[in-house]
């Protein structure tokens, strides 16, 4: 079901944990877990020694690429459950395992019958996703069957939980039945997910003008706008994505909405800044980020004239993640400051 309503959270609610305990007869860990930034810190400090990735390209997606690589290399074991190779498979712990799995476009015959999963979009719509393509290999397993297999193997070491892992993967309706009983909003899950177009999860303000606030009304908050003032010679760098990109997957080098093509190591800069520094378009430069007295330098970038406010520059994600210091995070969310990085730029002769 994914990481939105489905419960993938390093700080799950007591209500959700209680529901899991009632459904499966186990006692889930209630200790608060670690977000992405904290996980990298824990691996670097040796507090976490096993890293398991359910898809994705953690190394490339994470801030401070070199620090993240160092943390992964400190692990005793790194495991990647993946549909295709990526950079994270090449930077590993002492022992590394790659478990290839079926992609959502591939036909899933786990349990001897056609299976499907559901996905949830950012609008809160849940719908079924059925693969039809021939799998790349007859030996590929689905993600649910891989996870169940890992669980069964662990239980042979640490003791049985009472969960029938084989039944969960023999028919994915069984998994969805458990989701229905543990996550609010998934009533009649197996029936509704088969409806063309799927179904909407509850949204109290939309559904009935109900606001879960202390006043029972919609609360509006105003904040004063703040500008980040940088020292002379510095810029504020933001990372962006191109048109032909989905997360860390790059499908081509044609960012057609911006009129940029042929490469990705570009520094988009205002014309006035280029002229004021005596630079020129397509000039090769290095970028250095600055945070709390520390610096990170990355070379091999090219200046592109672009309609962006003076003293601001833009670079593509994930190539410029290397410049975002691990400790440079947003207040509250603890997410990397990918839209606000202080940098200086120097020409390379």
Question: Which sequence ranges carry the predicted segments?
Answer:
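Non-catalytic alpha/beta scaffold blocks inside enzyme catalytic domains
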Residues: 1-179, 233-236, 240-349
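Segments of small-molecule ligand-sensing domains
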Residues: 188-200
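Short acidic, Pro/Gly- and aromatic-enriched capping/linker segments at domain boundaries
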Residues: 199-207
């Amino acid at each position: 079901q994914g990481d939105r309503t489905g419960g993938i959270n390093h700080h799950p609610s007591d209500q959700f944990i209680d529901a899991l305990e009632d459904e499966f007869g186990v006692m889930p860990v209630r200790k608060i877990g670690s977000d992405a930034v904290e996980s990298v810190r824990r691996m670097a400090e040796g507090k976490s020694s096993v890293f398991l990735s359910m898809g994705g390209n953690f190394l490339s997606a994470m801030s401070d690429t070199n620090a993240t690589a160092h943390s992964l290399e400190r692990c005793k074991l790194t495991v990647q459950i993946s549909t295709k190779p990526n950079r994270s498979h090449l930077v590993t712990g002492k022992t590394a395992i790659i478990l290839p799995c079926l992609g959502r476009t591939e036909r899933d015959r786990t349990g001897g019958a056609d299976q499907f999963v559901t996905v949830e979009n950012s609008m809160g719509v849940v719908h079924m996703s059925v693969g039809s393509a021939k799998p790349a290999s007859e030996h590929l397993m689905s993600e649910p069957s891989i996870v169940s297999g890992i669980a069964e193997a662990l239980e042979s070491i640490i003791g049985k939980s009472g969960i029938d892992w084989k039944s969960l993967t023999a028919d994915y309706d069984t998994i969805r039945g458990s989701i229905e009983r543990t996550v609010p909003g998934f009533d009649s899950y197996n029936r509704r997910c088969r409806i063309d177009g799927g179904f909407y999860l509850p949204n109290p303000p939309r559904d009935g003008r109900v606001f879960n606030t202390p006043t029972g009304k919609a609360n509006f908050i105003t904040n004063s706008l703040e500008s980040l003032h940088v020292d002379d010679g510095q810029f504020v760098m933001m990372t962006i994505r191109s048109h032909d990109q989905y997360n860390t997957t790059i499908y081509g080098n044609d960012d057609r909405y911006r009129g940029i093509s042929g490469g990705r190591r570009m520094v988009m800069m205002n014309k006035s800044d280029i002229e004021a520094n005596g630079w020129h378009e397509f000039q090769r430069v290095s970028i250095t980020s600055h945070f709390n007295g520390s610096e990170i330098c990355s070379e091999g970038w090219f200046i592109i004239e672009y309609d962006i406010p003076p003293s601001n520059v833009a670079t593509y994600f994930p190539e410029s993640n290397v410049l975002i210091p691990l400790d440079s995070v947003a207040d509250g969310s603890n997410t990397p400051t990918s839209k606000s990085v202080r940098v200086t730029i120097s020409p390379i002769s």
